């Protein structure tokens, strides 16, 4: 029997305790889920509705981008959305608990997806990065790292669920950190931005598994120290340069955009201009002059938030970010209602994935986060990203759908 089949009262880590205080676990309307409640109950819809509205917002934004940007292939975007919705439905029907306890299999799968672009004959370069894969006899390419994020969620949830919400031994904590470290090291080779996503979601799952605060704080201090050392050595002649030149440049541009006025600094400046020119209500659908006139690079991918903001203005941005907040908060509420450790932590991982990607993408467009190329969930152009986000929606619904079934 998997750890996810555990009854009420187990797996009560940080998230459960917070849920008890916020929601009143013993007596609130959400405290006892009726066995007669169907898949279309309030909590189900509270997470699904904003997700579908975000897909619609992304589709409209990419359609406007396709009017002036050749790479923004709108039919291909629609194919990605359709495929994602179909896969999400299949995931929703699948009992996610079949993956509980399969830590070794999930570990191997996650690592394989991370290194897949580096396999000779499979990896495809784009914009100087080898993060895509083109399978033999298949005329499409995809980013396995995006699917690797989903695998990492299940990996860390499976590895952490066995402790039932309380990690007591330091050796167990180190084992969890090591489980995260290996695929993280592999993904950083291909995509530093995605590596940060995996680090955030993995760390969030470990924290919500009941890791002692002192251990977590010490780990954070270690990560900060190592990161600072990596940056310093990469900037110093005669020392090993761990960061690639473009990665170091992006960090320096974050500190001072004038360092690279024709490269990343230019991209950031144009993104700010696009956002600011949108004003309060925006220029209107299809009237994004910064992107339309070619001033805003990667307007349909990395800087899609700037493209959206120019057309829909401050009000539109508030609505968009409100939808993200609604979806993420609803996912957290669902996690609070789940007693099974594995299901709870899977939902935590999905919420962490969306949270970090939204904060990083929006933050880099307005200059408060370094430029990393992390896509904005449901909005940025890219079938691999859209498929991953919709799979996560399906996972959330699967966890909620199968919450009542006995082992």
Q: Where do the model's predicted regions map?
A:
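Hydrophobic transmembrane alpha-helices of multi-pass, membrane-embedded glycosylation machinery
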Residues: 199-207, 221-224, 393-394
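Hydrophobic alpha-helical transmembrane segments
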Residues: 79-87, 149, 311-329
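Transmembrane helix-bundle signature of multi-pass membrane transporters/permeases
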Residues: 295, 307-310, 350-354, 382-385
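Loop-to-helix entry and N-terminal half of a specific, functionally important transmembrane alpha helix
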Residues: 332-372
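Membrane-helix boundary/helix-loop-helix interface segments in multi-pass membrane proteins
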Residues: 2-54, 59-190, 196, 362-377, ...
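Alpha-helical transmembrane segments of multi-pass membrane proteins, especially transporters
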Residues: 76-77, 171-176, 219, 345-353
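Helix-loop-helix junctions and helix-breaking kinks within/between transmembrane helices
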Residues: 177-206, 233-237, 312-316
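Hydrophobic, glycine- and aromatic-enriched re-entrant/interface helices and adjoining loop segments
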Residues: 126-132, 218-318, 341-342
